[in-house]
A protein has these predicted regions:
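Interaction-mediating elements
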Residues: 1-111
């Protein structure tokens, strides 16, 4: 029996998170979105990535930690890389996009 897993992250800004997902080839949908799991179960997230073979990815804001949590049904994970590797790549892209955004807002130009 599958169930949704909630993974705490340090992802705190929406724009770099969306850009990181896009950089990795995903198409995130913003706003209150359903995240599909086992046998049609759903949870609501602030940002979602629909996966063709089920097991959507969702991100919902946790006000207590001031960060987004990743919500997915890990039993339905069917991507080409393990979940842990995906999360590592997402975090790396997020960090890069956060630095680029901060540099741009400070007036630096990145080539």
């Amino acid at each position: 029996m599958s169930h949704f897993s909630t993974v705490k992250t340090e992802l705190r800004q929406l724009e770099p998170l969306v850009q990181a997902l896009e950089d990795l080839g995903y198409t995130p949908d913003q706003g209150s979105q359903p995240v599909r799991g086992y046998r049609g179960q759903t949870v609501t997230a602030d940002l979602a990535v629909a996966m063709d073979d089920g097991g959507d990815l969702g991100f919902r804001w946790n006000a207590q930690t001031a960060a987004y949590e990743l919500v997915t049904d890990l039993d339905l994970w069917k991507q080409s890389i393990p979940f842990e590797r995906f999360l590592s790549k997402l975090t790396q892209r997020y960090a890069l996009n956060t630095v680029l955004k901060a540099s741009d807002s400070e007036g630096f130009q990145v080539a």
